C-alpha cells in the first residue's frame, strides 16, 4: 500500500478492504465527509492554498485540517486513483445563490467511470455536498445518506440540484470537458482572492455525521442538524470557545507546525468581521 493510502486510511479510520467497486466508493465518500471537515480558514488567516500533489495531503491528512473543494476533491481524486479507480476532476459554476450572470468555474468535482457507468463524486461542497456518489443520469432522483439529489442535462451542461424541503435547488452546473492543473490553480486563486468571494467574508465549517446529520459553523454560530432540521443552535461566547469547538466537534488539528494555528491567530481572523459573538449568524 502506498504512503498516501496508509495516511489517508488512518485519517478516516478505515480498516476494511478497498476493492475497486461502487461499495468502496460509497463507503470512502461518506467516511471522508464525516471525518475531514470543510473549512475556509486559510483564506482568512490568510495563507496561500497550494494545489501541488503534496500540499493538500499534508494539510488535510497529515495535519488533520480541513479545506475547500480544490483541496478536498484533490485529495479524494488522488486516493481513488491510487486504489485503481478511473477518475478525473471537472470544474463547475456555482449557482446556489441564483447569480444574475453566469459565474466562473470555481468548483472542483469528480467524474468516476466504474462498471460501465459514470458517477459524480463530490466531497467538497460544504454543508450541501454529496455524501455518496450519484449516477450521471438526467432527471433521476437519487438518495444519499444526507438527502435527495438529481442531475438535469441542459445541452452539454449538467446541473446538480438538491431537494430542500420539497423544493429543488440548483447547486452548480458543469460539463464533462477535461481540465488542466492550471484551471484548478486559476479557480482556487479566484475563490481565495476575489474581494466578493464569500470565502473571504465568513468563517465556514461543516462536518457530516454518519446518522444523516451535520454540524456547521458560520462565524460564531454553531448548528447541529438532524434530517435537515436544526436541533441545536448556539452563539459561541468568545474565541476560546470557538477554538475549542473546532477541535472537539469538527476534529480540526491545530498543532501542526505548518498548518496549525493558535487561538490568538484565530482571534485576529474573527476581529476582522463585522460581527461579534453575541450576534454571530
UniProtKB/Swiss-Prot annotation:
Temperature dependence as stated in the record? Optimum temperature is 37 degrees Celsius.
Q: Where does this one sit in the cell?
A: Cytoplasm
Activity regulation remarks: Inhibited by salicylic acid, acetylsalicylic acid, 2,6-dichrolo-4-nitrophenol, N-ethylmaleimide and iodoacetamide.
Keyword presence, Nucleus: no
Recount the PTM note.
Acetylated on Lys-214 and Lys-281. Deacetylated by CobB.
Q: At which residues is N6-acetyllysine found?
A: 214, 281
What UniProt keywords apply to this chain's record, in alphabetical order?
Answer: Acetylation, Acyltransferase, Cytoplasm, Transferase
Cellular component annotations (GO), alphabetically ordered: cytoplasm
Tell me, how does this one assemble? Homodimer.
Official protein name in the record: Arylamine N-acetyltransferase
Q: What is the scientific name of the source organism? A: Escherichia coli (strain K12)
Amino acid at each position: 500500500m502506498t504512503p498516501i493510502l496508509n495516511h489517508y486510511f488512518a485519517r478516516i479510520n478505515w480498516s476494511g478492504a478497498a476493492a475497486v467497486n461502487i461499495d468502496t466508493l460509497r463507503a470512502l465518500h461518506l467516511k471522508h465527509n464525516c471525518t475531514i471537515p470543510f473549512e475556509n480558514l486559510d483564506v482568512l488567516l490568510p495563507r496561500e492554498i497550494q494545489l501541488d500533489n503534496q500540499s493538500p495531503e499534508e494539510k488535510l491528512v497529515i495535519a488533520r485540517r480541513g479545506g475547500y473543494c480544490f483541496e478536498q476533491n484533490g485529495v479524494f481524486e488522488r486516493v481513488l486513483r491510487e486504489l485503481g479507480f478511473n477518475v478525473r476532476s471537472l470544474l463547475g459554476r456555482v449557482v446556489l445563490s441564483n447569480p444574475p450572470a453566469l459565474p466562473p468555474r470555481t468548483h472542483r468535482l469528480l467524474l468516476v467511470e466504474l462498471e460501465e457507468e459514470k458517477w459524480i463524486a463530490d466531497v467538497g461542497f460544504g454543508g450541501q455536498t454529496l455524501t455518496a456518489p450519484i449516477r450521471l443520469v438526467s432527471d433521476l432522483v437519487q438518495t444519499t445518506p444526507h438527502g435527495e439529489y438529481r442531475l438535469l442535462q441542459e445541452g452539454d451542461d449538467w446541473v446538480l440540484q438538491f431537494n430542500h424541503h420539497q423544493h429543488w435547488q440548483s447547486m452548480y452546473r458543469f460539463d464533462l470537458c477535461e481540465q488542466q492543473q492550471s484551471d484548478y490553480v486559476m479557480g482556487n486563486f479566484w475563490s481565495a482572492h476575489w474581494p466578493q468571494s464569500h470565502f473571504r467574508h465568513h468563517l465556514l465549517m461543516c462536518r457530516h455525521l454518519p446518522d444523516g446529520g451535520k454540524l456547521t459553523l458560520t462565524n460564531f454560530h454553531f448548528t447541529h442538524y438532524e434530517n435537515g432540521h436544526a436541533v441545536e443552535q448556539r452563539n459561541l461566547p468568545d474565541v476560546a470557545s470557538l477554538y475549542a469547538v473546532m477541535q472537539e466537534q469538527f476534529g480540526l488539528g491545530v498543532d501542526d507546525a505548518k498548518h496549525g494555528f493558535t487561538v490568538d491567530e484565530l482571534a485576529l481572523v474573527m476581529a476582522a468581521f463585522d460581527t461579534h459573538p453575541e450576534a454571530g449568524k
